[in-house]
């Protein structure tokens, strides 16, 4: 019987079984303990040296970012990131917005971050997407992107101001 000691956890395994490391073993070391009965009927116990501490392997962020709202001037879009998860835990999530005229080259929307974006005249004719930066509990940052919106449609704005008529000549 192979017994692996992981931190303070005892993992009892059958002969020739492999101990598969999981997230719960990160930060611990382990050793194998082998016990057997020798040919004289005496129980023998062998211990391996402790392993190095188990390092974390970056687990991918699961889920997707969704945009709610119609891509039209004057409308507010909302990026939803509540379906995101990471086996390493999530320390922080930040949302920013990007715009593109061609759907290939993306530029950050200046100084706008957070889950909402108000579509104004400067975004008309562009596609918009949300960029979500997820930092896990081990400090690894992963960027995810929403699907791009359709092109932001223009709204025919009412003219504003006043008309002044001046007489020219006599």
Residue map of PLM features:
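Surface-exposed, flexible coil segments in extracellular/virion-facing regions
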Residues: 13-21, 103-119
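Single conserved hydrophobic/aromatic residue that forms the stacking wall/gate
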Residues: 1-12
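A short beta-strand segment in extracellular, disulfide-stabilized domains
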Residues: 73-82
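Short, solvent-exposed loop/turn segments at the edges of extracellular beta-sandwich modules
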Residues: 36-43, 103, 135-141
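Conserved aromatic beta-strand anchor motif in extracellular beta-sandwich/beta-rich domains
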Residues: 8-9, 94-101
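Proline-enriched interdomain boundary motifs that mark the N-terminal boundary
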Residues: 57-67, 155-165
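Solvent-exposed loop segments of extracellular immunoglobulin-like
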Residues: 85-96
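Terminal edge beta-strands and adjacent linker/stalk segments
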Residues: 45-56, 143-154
């Amino acid at each position: 019987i192979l017994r692996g000691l992981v931190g303070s956890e005892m993992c009892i395994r059958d002969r020739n079984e492999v101990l598969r490391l999981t997230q719960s073993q990160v930060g611990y070391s382990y050793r194998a303990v082998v016990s057997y009965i020798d040919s004289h009927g005496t129980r023998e116990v062998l211990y391996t040296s402790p392993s190095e501490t188990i390092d974390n392997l970056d687990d991918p962020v699961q889920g997707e970012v969704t945009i709610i709202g119609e891509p039209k001037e004057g409308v507010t879009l909302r990026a939803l990131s509540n379906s995101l998860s990471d086996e390493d835990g999530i320390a922080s999530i930040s949302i920013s917005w990007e715009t593109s005229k061609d759907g290939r080259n993306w530029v950050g929307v200046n100084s706008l971050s957070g889950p909402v974006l108000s579509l104004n005249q400067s975004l008309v004719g562009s596609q918009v997407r949300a960029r979500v930066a997820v930092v896990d509990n081990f400090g690894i940052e992963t960027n995810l992107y929403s699907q791009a919106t359709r092109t932001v449609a223009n709204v025919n704005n009412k003219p504003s101001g006043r008309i002044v008529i001046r007489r020219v000549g006599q």
